[in-house]
From Swiss-Prot:
Gene3D superfamilies: SecB-like (3.10.420.10)
One GO term of the biological process aspect: protein folding
Main location: cytoplasm
GO cellular component terms listed in the entry, alphabetical order: cytoplasm
Membership in a protein family: Belongs to the SecB family.
Record protein name field: Protein-export protein SecB
Lineage: superkingdom: Bacteria
Subunit architecture: Homotetramer, a dimer of dimers. One homotetramer interacts with 1 SecA dimer.
UniProt keyword list: Chaperone, Cytoplasm, Protein transport, Translocation, Transport
Cell compartments where the protein resides: Cytoplasm
GO molecular-function terms, A-Z: unfolded protein binding
Length: 147
């Protein structure tokens, strides 16, 4: 009787790969009044490191502008993780890398953005959760349509 191998999904390491903050109009920008327009962009990526090990990145870029022209700040964070995935079917591996891993990483990226912006002298930026499953489904549909 053969023993079935159990699937393995584990977090091996979480780390900040890149963190940058620019306040191009300091110190004058702190004297200006008004509600900033905040724009957030999120991207994900993954790469296989070696058998069963993958690196996943979630990059969050937040730009705040006054009157849609003067940049208050530009903050970019790449939160990364090394994940171990073994004995998992390939289609499930892609789902884990595109949905589960980014869901694990995003709260860390969100905290890094909020903390960095606050330490720069601005009010905290509260980023809404991201539906990585919907993004993954859209990417799958776009790839299927292009094939």
């Amino acid at each position: 009787m053969s023993e079935e191998l159990q699937p393995v999904f584990s977090i091996e390491r979480l780390y900040v790969k890149d963190l940058s903050l620019e306040v191009p109009h300091a110190p004058q920008i702190f004297l200006e009044q008004g509600e900033p327009e905040v724009d957030m962009r999120v991207s994900t990526g993954s790469q296989k490191l070696e058998d069963g090990y993958y690196n996943v990145d979630v990059t969050v870029t937040v730009t705040a502008k006054l009157d849609n022209e003067r940049t208050m700040f530009l903050n970019e964070v790449t939160q990364s993780g090394i994940f171990r995935l073994e004995n998992i079917p390939e289609e499930d591996v892609q789902l884990l890398l595109g949905v589960a891993c980014p869901n694990i990483l995003f709260p860390y990226a969100r905290e890094a953005v909020s903390g960095t912006v606050t330490r720069a002298g601005f009010p905290p930026v509260l980023l809404a959760p991201i539906n990585f499953e919907a993004i993954y489904q859209q990417q799958q549909e776009a790839e299927a349509a292009g094939a």
